Amino acid sequence: MPEQTRSYVAIDLKSFYASVECKERNLDPLTTNLVVADPERTTKTICLAVSPALKAYGIPGRARLFEVVRKVKEINDERKRKNGGHEFTGQSCDTGELKADRSFALDYITAVPRMALYMKCSTEIYNIYLKYVAPEDIHVYSIDEVFMDVTDYLNTYRMTARELAGKIIREIQQETSIAATAGIGTNLYLCKVAMDIVAKHIEPDQNGVRIAELTEISYRKLLWAHQPITDFWRVGPGYAKKLAEVGLFTMGDVARCSLGKPGEYYNEDLLYRLFGVNAELLI
């Protein structure tokens, strides 16, 4: 009897800390410019989160506070130029207001981190997961991310993995106002990569939810040539540099290298020489 194909779901809470801070202020993180950072630690402090609205201006999620200040100044200089050089008549943190009135300067809220609050919200969301999946099938990866093995639940609920993930995400949104993204795969790696890379580049469904799926075959078709390679789970700049030094720039390159025959330059042994036992993360 063939082994059952397993279904894994990864769920990531979108800009979690920033979304919680917006929720506490009855604001929408999709339209509110907000960063989570402690300005008393100097402007070199790293922002724990940036709201999706502010990210849309090109500000990365883990920027230093001085980078946010600099980018906002650049944006306002450009807004003033497009407004004929006139002085601003006001300022706003809301993207709708900023689009409607060019005489407003872009502003943002700086929220001091409140870890106890984030843990409380994360626990509330974990309890939503428990409505659908037993704790032994949930792996908490971080405060805002989980993996779930949903294989044994699909027949019970008479749902596909996509339908179950969508139902869970919609309940999170309804109960906590926190948006989430999901990846689905036949193993943990594929569901994580589906969430991290593919879901970010697809249009949301009619409920505003992004869910991406990968199989071994679709992974090869969609992502073997994807760059930068650092977008992939567990491939940091150090790994990417070592791979580039031997002419490997994509996951397709790595896969072909791992299939090389003994005695050839590109083979599994090359990866083990470069990374030791950690080569197993790539092969």
What residue ranges belong to the model's regions?
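Gly/Gly-Pro- and Ser/Thr-rich, intrinsically disordered tail segments characteristic of DNA damage-repair
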Residues: 1-282
